[in-house]
Structure formats: C-alpha cells, structure tokens
C-alpha cells in the first residue's frame, strides 16, 4: 500500500490497488454481449476496472478491523458481475461502486490470520439483534441490510463502505472474523465462507 500526501495539507492518506465494479449500464451490456464469445473481452470492456484509491473509512463504532487479504476466492456471483449476467434484483441491496471479493483469508490488524464471514448483519451495522440468540444475519425482513452505519450491501464484496477482497485492504467487523488454525492452509481457509 502506498502512502500519498494529498493537497497542500500534511494529511496522509492510504492508497491501495483494487478491482472495482462501477454502475455503468453500458459496460454491463458490453460484458453481457461479449461473455459468450470471450470472457477475457467481457472482463476487459465490462464494469470492472483497476483503481488506485483510498482504503475504506472505518465506521465510528466499536469492533472494526482493517484486514489485508492473503488470498481471495472468485465466486460465481463475482463472475456473473464481471460477465454482465448479474441479476438486477439485488440492486437495492448493493452500494456502487464496490470492490468484489467475499471469500477471504486475511491478516488482521490485531495480528490474527482470519477468515471472513461476509454477511453484513445487525452487529456490523450497529443495529440490535431481532431476537435473543439471533445469528449475525438473522431477521425476517432483511431491512437491516440497508440500515445502520454502513451503506446498503448484503455482504462484504457488495458494499461500498467495507471494500472487498479484490483489494489490498478492506474493513471487517469482529463478528465477521474467525481465527484460522495454524494447521489450515490459506488455500483451505479461503473456502470456508
């Protein structure tokens, strides 16, 4: 990660490389048309671009960590985005632009090697659980996926606020992070999702 001085101030900003999906209808259309002929062409001319930008901002809340991916998977949902075949059904549950990548094994800022549970549930968003004993993503209406102190997003990798594993850094809530045993390789851990 580069540290870059911006403007005339002494403010230092972390810059990172990331693959980002932008909401550009024409690029999605081109990717969809090209993907049956050339998946490389779909990726090259579609909505995915390599950017150098600031790392995600930490929410003003407890329990958040910066993580640096060691290995990130490429899921079918990621491929459908790159190839222009993603359903628009979930558009309200996503915040553009976003960095894909929700199958992640990473180094956490507290020294742990962790795997990411990608759901951006109640705990991540600073919202109360809907009932006692609820899991992080439980709920009956899923309105929490657009609430709290994060932008809309079903999970990490589809939310502008958190970033995703296709970048050199992202943020994750403690409720999403699970320590990886030493006996488990990164290649095994990335499949945990």
Identify the residue ranges that each predicted region occupies.
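Short N-terminal strand-loop motif that marks the start
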Residues: 2-100, 168
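Hydrophobic residues at beta-strand termini and immediately following loops
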Residues: 53, 170-172, 180, 192
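Glycine-rich beta-strand-centered segment in the early N-terminal region that forms part
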Residues: 55-72, 87-144, 176, 181-183
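Glycine-centered small-residue hotspots that permit tight backbone geometry or close packing
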Residues: 73-76, 157-159, 193
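Active-site phosphate/pyrophosphate-handling residues
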Residues: 80, 103, 190
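Alpha-helix-centered segments that form part of catalytic cores
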Residues: 140-178
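A glycine-rich, Thr/Ser-enriched phosphate-binding loop motif common to dinucleotide/cofactor-binding enzymes
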Residues: 160-167, 184-193
